[in-house]
Each structure stands twice: as structure tokens, then as C-alpha cells.
């Protein structure tokens, strides 16, 4: 077991993990399971720093997969309203297992590669319910998180193997690859007795080029770690300047 692993439960009344195939037509429909990128966003909302990246290991689906259609009046680009039907997942709950790895593309933040510090800060953030608001795919689908356990009983515990075909996995941003391009990744997920084990982003079987991107320039501001003596230089106990 990885020492920096976090296991959380996330749940909400509705979820909208929009299928890219339905996004263009205006009537969104949710994928049946959350994508890697969605879960990474949920965990990052709990706690994130640019010095490390979250890696999603697996997710357990606790409740039956059910959908519900809603009539929505989205705002038109030129004003006024339109009528559309969105298909949501209803009464969703998941157990997410994830760990963090230090961002080797940010050597300027090497002083912040403190595993114990980030692990315990993330653990406290999880116990308090995250640092930022949690959403299940869309702003209108608020959710809540708490410490979880993969052994919690779920609806699909004895349902065997379920396949979901070719599905969206994640995005690869320009600052995450040497070419500086934006890519979309796809894979074939399978659920074994309610648990989906994710492949790493670089292991996805299908990668599609989207567009040429621009890498963000990194600053040369020196970063000090929390264990550096000079970090508190000039201060005395109580936080006051000497």
C-alpha cells in the first residue's frame, strides 16, 4: 500500500459526466461512470498543489446506475432561452482510491516535495470536507466527500464483469508533454464486481491530437521548503518580527 494513498467517499443527488458525443448537440447526456479526469478534479478540489499530481487508482460504484431526464432552459448565445433535455445520473455514490506523485516537470518546486506534509494536509482536508466545493461533473450537481473504505458494500459487489466500450479517460495538457500539444485520451473500462481500476494516462490505448498549445512559462522565484531554517529568519515565537 502506498503511504500517501487517500481513500474517500463522494456522493450526491445527481451527476452529469457529459459524454463528448452529446455535447455538440446541446442536449447533454451523462456517461454511465465517472472518467479519470472527473475523479482527478474531485480529489484536486479536496487538496492540490502544483508540486504534485494526483493519480487515480480505482473507483467503486456503490449505488445502482440510474438516469433521470430534466427539462433545461439554457441561455442562447445571442440572448433568450432554448429548451433542452439533460440526462443525469441520480443518487450516486463512489469510493475513490488515489495517491499523489511529485511533479517532475516542476523542478523549481523541488523544495516542496515533502511527502509527509502533503499527505497529512490532504488527510485533514478530507476529514473537513475538502478545501473547495465538490461537484459531480457540473456545477448544478453538488456533492460531499468524507473518508471512505473500499470494503463498503455496493450494489455491484456480486455482478461480475461489466464493459462500457470506448470511453473518454482524460486530457493531456501542453505542460504535461514534450510536444506542447493538447491531447484527449480514450480507453475501454471494465467494472469487476463494482470496482473499476484505471490505467495510467500514459497507458491509454487511444490518444487523439486536439490542437497545438502553449506551455506556461515557469517563474524563477526561489521556493523554500517548510524544513528550511531561513524560512523563519527574522521571526520569533508567536509570529512577530524580532
Where are each of the predicted segments found?
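Extracellular structured ligand-interaction cores
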Residues: 5, 56, 91-95
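N-terminal, Lys/Arg- and Ser/Thr-rich interaction peptides
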Residues: 1-26, 196, 215-216
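Short, hydrophobic/aromatic beta-strand segments
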Residues: 19, 54-56, 107-109
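Glycine/small-residue-rich interface belts in oligomeric ring/scaffold proteins
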Residues: 29-71
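Beta-strand elements of well-folded, non-transmembrane domains
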Residues: 10-14, 63, 96-104
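Short, flexible N-terminal segments of the mature chain
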Residues: 22-40, 120, 124-129
Amino acid at each position: 500500500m502506498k503511504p500517501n494513498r487517500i481513500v474517500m467517499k463522494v456522493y450526491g443527488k445527481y451527476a452529469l459526466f457529459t459524454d463528448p458525443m452529446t455535447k455538440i448537440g446541446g442536449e447533454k447526456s451523462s456517461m454511465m461512470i465517472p472518467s479519470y479526469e472527473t475523479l482527478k478534479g474531485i480529489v484536486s478540489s479536496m487538496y492540490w498543489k502544483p508540486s504534485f499530481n494526483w493519480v487515480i487508482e480505482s473507483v467503486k460504484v456503490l449505488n445502482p446506475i440510474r438516469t433521470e431526464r430534466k427539462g433545461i432552459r439554457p441561455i442562447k448565445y445571442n440572448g433568450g432561452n432554448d429548451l433542452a433535455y439533460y440526462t443525469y445520473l441520480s443518487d450516486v455514490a463512489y469510493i475513490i482510491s488515489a495517491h499523489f506523485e511529485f511533479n517532475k516537470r516542476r523542478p523549481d518546486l523541488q523544495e516542496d516535495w515533502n511527502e509527509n506534509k502533503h499527505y497529512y494536509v490532504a488527510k485533514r482536508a478530507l476529514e473537513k470536507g475538502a478545501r473547495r466545493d465538490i461537484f459531480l461533473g457540473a456545477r448544478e450537481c453538488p456533492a460531499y466527500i468524507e473518508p471512505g473504505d473500499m470494503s463498503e458494500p455496493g450494489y455491484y459487489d456480486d455482478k461480475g464483469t461489466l464493459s462500457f466500450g470506448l470511453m473518454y479517460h482524460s486530457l493531456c495538457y501542453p505542460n504535461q508533454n514534450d510536444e506542447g500539444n493538447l491531447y484527449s485520451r480514450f480507453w475501454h473500462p471494465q467494472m469487476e464486481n463494482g470496482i473499476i481500476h484505471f490505467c495510467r494516462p500514459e497507458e491509454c490505448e487511444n490518444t487523439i491530437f486536439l490542437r497545438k498549445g502553449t506551455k506556461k512559462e515557469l517563474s524563477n522565484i526561489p521556493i523554500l521548503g517548510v524544513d528550511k531554517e531561513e524560512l523563519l529568519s527574522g521571526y520569533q515565537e508567536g509570529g512577530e518580527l524580532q
